[in-house]
Amino acid sequence: IVPRRGFSCSQLAMPFLKDKLKTFHNFASSTLETIYTPSRLAESKKYEVNTLEHSVLMNEAGHFKLINLPREAQIAPSFGSELIDIDDDGVLDIILAHNFFSPQRETGRMDGGLSLALKGNGDCTYTPLPHSVSGISISGDTRRVIAIDLDGNGIKEIAFAQNNGPMIIYSKKR
């Protein structure tokens, strides 16, 4: 096991590392056990990630079934999602707000998404709509999406909030 974070980030969070390891080379060639000691690691909290995919949970008579969203939904992190029937077929669709421009320096920007509309198939599976069909195409650092009737006409608009960017609002074609 090796450290996940780089030396710069780690020593800012834990200043003792700078004195203990002194150089980037020493940090890079160390294992977690040599940095933190086996006893410290044994005492530490441990978390396990079972999936990183964007998913939905379907309630099947008291237990939940995890269903991963299509590959297009996995292109970038999503900090916001909204359920709305965008095509008036009686089935809820999903809108995702994609991208993350400010992770840790050593991770780099996660900016491969344009946000995404997923058409519900009625069985907790979803089909991605091309951006040319949905009209949704946002290359910014979106943080939230909400469906809200902004003009009082009974039809919900889809509003995207961006980090350090303008709000973008989409309306249904009439």
Segments the model singles out, each with a brief description of its role:
Residues 1-174:
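Beta-propeller-forming repeat regions
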